[in-house]
Design a protein with these regions (language model features):
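Coupling and communication elements adjacent to P-loop NTPase active sites across diverse families
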Residues: 1-11, 95-211
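ABC ATP-binding cassette signature C-motif
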Residues: 1-108, 191, 195-382
């Protein structure tokens, strides 16, 4: 309690801010992403507090388990517009998936009908052109056609064809207007490197040391293709352990084995240091610009953002810059420190599917319980 606020960990700062918010019992709580940096027990505590608050509140969060524990309404800001429904996050998402499946099926049917109408319109246009050509009879036939009769007949045929074509185009536009803009996330790709050694890391009694204190010693082995979650309370030294693995000179006890020639891709917890445009960051890290920008587009970046200074980005956009850069790197080991802080729901799901599909060797810190349960092949608790 005597330490300056700036020296606290991200989760400890979040706890202090929430405590200050809840002290004012007369105010209407408006809470913006309270789970960022907050550990598992802290999230459970805040969720329970809100559930039993006895009055209304407005909450922004992308943590699925947290939302299920404390809300009874969902206001979803979808691409097609806002949607307010009664229920938990899980009930809303199940209904959304059911609706999306139905809309996808209807979209495919409509696209088939549009293709058939376009083909029919093309044939009709051909008839119209053919009718126009009959006005100009060939001179090689040896006959002298009645141009007045043929002109009248072809004009009627052409007018009929044009009317049919207009009706077909109107039907095409009507069908196209029925197509639904369904919220879908593009799949991401990753190219992890295979390590010559099956064992990438091994820690024995490893703990970061602090002035007057020492973290809890941990032991683990991380093999090729495994995904290890470091779990622990705020301030327990998880980030310090990641920095040790990166090779930083941090006072510690115990031993750490790292496979020789280990290539590591690192996503730090904070992204406040980002400056310049995305192209500048790509050049600094020596990663392919086209691939980098493509990944950002798949993570819902607009092209307009590429010309802006990253210092002007939201916290979630800056975090996506770090994640996209990591996904551009081929590495033996991916080291991610709270990668989901400030990240929206659909991007979280994209990242989960990516990790399950490409199975990189990953050591991560993340308090999102759903992400932990889906991704971690082992959990080490501090």
């Amino acid at each position: 309690l005597d330490r300056p606020f700036s020296t606290l960990s991200g989760g400890e700062q979040t706890r202090a801010l929430l405590a200050g918010l809840f002290l004012d019992e007369g105010a209407y709580p408006m809470i913006d992403e309270p789970t960022n940096h907050l550990d598992g027990p802290g999230r459970a505590l805040v969720s329970e507090y809100l559930r039993n608050l006895g009055r209304g509140f407005l909450l922004v969060s992308h943590d699925r388990a947290f939302l299920d524990g404390c809300v009874d309404h969902i206001l979803a800001l979808n691409h097609t517009g806002p949607e307010l429904v009664r229920g938990t996050f899980s009930s809303w998402f199940r209904d959304k998936e059911d609706r999306d499946r139905g809309e996808l099926a209807r979209n495919e049917k409509l696209k088939g009908e549009i293709r058939r109408l376009e083909q029919a319109a093309k044939r009709t246009s051909g008839w119209s052109d053919k009718a126009e050509k009959t006005k100009h009879a060939t001179r090689n036939s040896g006959l002298r056609p009645d141009r007045g009769f043929i002109g009248h007949k072809s004009a009627k045929m052409m007018q009929r064809a044009k009317n049919i074509e207009r009706r077909q185009q109107s039907a095409i536009q009507e069908k196209a207007g029925l197509l639904k803009d369904i919220e879908r996330a593009d799949s991401l790709k990753l190219t992890p490197l295979a390590c010559h050694s099956g064992r990438l890391l091994e820690a024995r009694g490893l703990a970061a040391a602090y002035p007057g204190a020492e973290g809890r010693p941990v032991g683990f082995t991380l093999n090729q293709g495994e995904r290890l979650c470091l779990d622990g309370g705020n301030g327990s030294g998880k980030t310090s352990l990641l920095r040790l693995i990166l090779g930083e000179d941090i006072p510690h006890t115990g031993t750490l084995f790292r496979a020789s020639g280990l290539e590591i891709s690192y996503v730090p917890q904070k992204a406040d240091h980002l400056q310049g445009k995305p192209v500048d960051w790509a050049e600094k890290l020596d990663i392919g610009l086209t691939k980098f920008l493509t990944i950002l587009r798949k993570l819902d970046f607009s092209r307009e953002l590429f010309s802006r200074n990253m210092a002007e980005y939201s916290a979630g956009q800056r975090k996506k810059i770090l994640l996209a850069a990591s996904l551009c790197q081929s590495a033996h080991l991916y080291l991610w420190d709270e990668p989901l802080n400030y990240i929206d729901l659909f991007s979280r799901m994209q990242i989960e599917e990516l990790l399950l599909q490409y199975r990189p060797t990953l050591l991560f810190v993340e308090h999102d319980r759903v992400f932990q349960e889906r991704i971690a092949t082992q959990v080490v608790r501090l």
